[in-house]
UniProtKB/Swiss-Prot annotation:
Residues 31-109 form the RRM domain. The modification Phosphoserine is found at residue 160. The gene is cwf29. SUPFAM superfamilies: RNA-binding domain, RBD. Belongs to the 40S cdc5-associated complex (or cwf complex), a spliceosome sub-complex reminiscent of a late-stage spliceosome composed of the U2, U5 and U6 snRNAs and at least brr2, cdc5, cwf2/prp3, cwf3/syf1, cwf4/syf3, cwf5/ecm2, spp42/cwf6, cwf7/spf27, cwf8, cwf9, cwf10, cwf11, cwf12, prp45/cwf13, cwf14, cwf15, cwf16, cwf17, cwf18, cwf19, cwf20, cwf21, cwf22, cwf23, cwf24, cwf25, cwf26, cyp7/cwf27, cwf28, cwf29/ist3, lea1, msl1, prp5/cwf1, prp10, prp12/sap130, prp17, prp22, sap61, sap62, sap114, sap145, slu7, smb1, smd1, smd3, smf1, smg1 and syf2. Residues 119-138, 154-217 are annotated as: Disordered. This is U2 snRNP component ist3. The keyword Phosphoprotein applies.
Length: 217
């Protein structure tokens, strides 16, 4: 119980902090998060139970295989308060759920491909009496590892096959950040190695110079 209260206090403090200079600010216009590497046995209710700790979910989309209906291991969830996405990303990334380390990240834009004129399904929220709008994503053309799709200003719209080709990759920004971080790290390593080599060459020149002076003397 004490640990739960401590988490709640930390979450409240985090929400009260200004994050204009934080990387989270880049996603201040989107209340959606991407949740990846989910166990295939988890369903919408399981995900809501875990992520409702950080705010009130108002939309969830657990992507399923079109033919089998089985989970493909990733989902998109929208919070009522955009600031809840910051808490979810900071607190749930690399947290183990059923022996899997889940990946959680912001989603910059999200288009929802639907079959033409197909109504959205509704998933009950249990005892709350309200419901979540769940859009059906057409996954027939997407491999399991391909995370194409996602929202654009929280709209549910019908997309033609041509439109689906223009879907944004929800992991694009995350991948770019990781690449920049890796390149920066490699650049730092090369710089340190270069400094070390220069120091070594200087030391060898200095040693040779001393030996020459000793011989001359």
């Amino acid at each position: 119980m004490n640990s739960i209260r401590q988490i709640e206090r930390l979450n409240e403090q985090e929400l009260d902090k200004p994050f204009s200079s934080s990387w989270h600010q880049d996603y201040s216009d989107s209340a959606y998060i991407y949740i990846g590497n989910l166990d295939f046995d988890l369903n919408e209710d399981d995900i809501l139970c875990v992520f409702s700790e950080f705010g009130e979910p108002v939309d969830i989309n657990l992507v399923r295989d079109k033919e089998t209906g089985k989970s493909k291991g990733f989902a998109f969830l929208k919070y009522e308060d955009q600031r809840s996405t910051v808490l979810a990303v900071d607190n749930m990334t690399n947290v183990k759920l059923l022996d899997r380390l889940v990946r959680v990240d912001h989603v910059a834009s999200y288009k929802v491909p639907q079959k033409e004129k197909e109504p959205a399904n509704l998933v009950p929220l249990g005892e709350s009496g309200s419901s979540l709008s769940v859009s059906t994503i057409n996954t027939s053309n997407l491999p399991d590892h391909d995370y194409k799709t996602i929202i654009q200003n929280e709209v549910e719209q019908t997309l033609s096959p041509k439109d689906e080709k223009d879907l944004l990759d929800p992991m694009r920004d995350y991948i770019h950040r990781e690449k920049r971080r890796k390149l920066k790290h490699e650049s730092s390593d090369r710089s340190d190695k270069s400094d070390s080599n220069r120091h070594s060459r200087h030391h060898r020149r200095h040693s040779r110079s001393r030996r020459h002076r000793d011989l001359d003397g």
